[in-house]
Amino acid sequence: LLTLLADLSADKRNRVIIVSGRDRATLEKWLGHLPLDFIVEHGVWLRALGEEWTMLRPLTNDWMHEIRPILDLHVSRTAGSFVEEKEYSLVWHYRRADIELGEVRARELTSHLHFLASNSDLQVMEGNKVVEVKSAGVNKGAGAARWLSFYPADFIIAIGDDRTDEDTFGAMPSHAYTVKVGSTHRSLARFHLDTHHDVRRVLRALVEA
């Protein structure tokens, strides 16, 4: 995959943007050696190639001290789960927990957090074996739309495999090729690929086009 990204970004006609829920440090460690653009922490931070990180909009993390104990409580009640603290969001991961227990605890946590967020500028987001709390109005789609306002393109392809990628699909212009990977559940994407192997074949075809 790294080779494909390098080959795609080597063509000066292309701009390759990584849109991720991961934090800046992680993406820089994994992919910082490649000439890529980044939208990270679900749209909180944007960085075009050769430029500095900028925020989608001013945010505060003052709310974290109230929400963190709730997530920690679910960690104590769910073996294998853990909390990830980013700059402007908190994430409860349960990928390593018992499947059934993890799903039950996730529903409980989501319900509790939705109640707390109803009177605040926060939103609760469910992803792939994660529950995330962050500022309202910040998501992958908002970040992608902001990026496109700076760098419009004739050909756009957006590929994602997570629930949170639906925001990106929804933010794309009508001429964009939006592709959901994996789950065949209802999606805003126009196209579907079964596995990451199919994604690699598509990327290779783009390199060779």
PLM ranges: what are they?
Residues 1-86:
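Active-site phosphate-binding/coordination module
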Residues 2-9, 110-113, 145, 169:
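Short amphipathic alpha-helical segments and helix-helix/interface helices
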Residues 15-17, 37, 123, 157, ...:
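A structural signal for isolated positions on well-ordered beta-strands in alpha/beta enzyme cores
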Residues 41, 47-65, 125-153:
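Substrate-recognition "cap/lid" segment bordering the active-site pocket of phosphatases
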Residues 63, 99-104:
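Short, conserved charged micro-motifs
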Residues 67-71, 104-117:
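Short amphipathic alpha-helices in soluble, non-transmembrane regions
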Residues 81-99, 121-134:
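Charged, glycine-interspersed solvent-exposed loop segments at helix/strand-loop junctions
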Residues 136, 141-209:
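Mg2+-dependent phosphoryl-transfer enzymes with acidic/Ser/Thr/Gly-rich catalytic loops
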